[in-house]
Design a protein with these regions (language model features):
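RNase H-like polynucleotidyl transferase catalytic core
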Residues: 64-81, 98
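Electropositive, glycine- and tryptophan-enriched low-complexity nucleic-acid-binding patches
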Residues: 1-41
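The start of beta-strands in P-loop NTPase/AAA+ ATPase cores
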Residues: 43-44, 68
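C-terminal anion-handling pockets and recognition modules
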Residues: 82-141
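Acidic, metal-coordinating catalytic cores used for nucleic-acid/nucleotide bond scission
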Residues: 22, 45-59, 74-79
Length: 141
């Protein structure tokens, strides 16, 4: 099992990391990594309601990193574009013979980097929540 944390930006540098656990300390460390890779960008992060995401320390850390958090309603992963990336990665893994944990992590890392460069996973989200004008700006129009 590979416990992966991922950041899929609309504009910015995607970040993926593997953690032993999914505790609030791990969440805070990941927030710092996101900020390190995106030092000047405004960061708005969409999260589910996992307990470590909503912990006071996690929220405090996000504020210190200048990251705005948006928590999704319960049972609504379809509102988070990164879930479509995870689903696509799981599809690849399901057709791959995995030699060991390092091999699994390498596949996840490579596919995440590949897929996170595509805005297609966020197309409908961008249009629905940010508007068509923002989408056209991202595309250079």
């Amino acid at each position: 099992k590979a416990n992966a944390f991922g950041f899929y930006p609309v504009n910015g540098i995607p970040v993926i990391d593997f953690k032993e656990h999914s505790k609030k300390e791990d969440v805070c460390d990941f927030f710092r990594q996101i900020r390190l890779h995106n030092p000047t960008k405004e960061i708005v992060l969409t999260l589910d309601n996992f307990r470590a995401h909503k912990a006071k320390d996690s929220i405090k850390c996000a504020n210190e990193c200048g990251i705005k958090l948006i928590f999704l309603p319960p049972y609504s992963p379809d509102l988070n574009p990164i879930e479509f990336i995870w689903k696509s990665i799981k599809r690849v893994i399901s057709h791959t013979f995995i030699k060991d944990l390092n091999h699994l992590r390498r596949i996840i890392f490579e596919k995440f980097q590949e897929y996170a460069k595509r805005l297609s996973f966020a197309d409908s989200w961008i249009e629905k929540f940010l508007g068509k004008k923002y989408k056209l700006n991202l595309l250079g129009f």
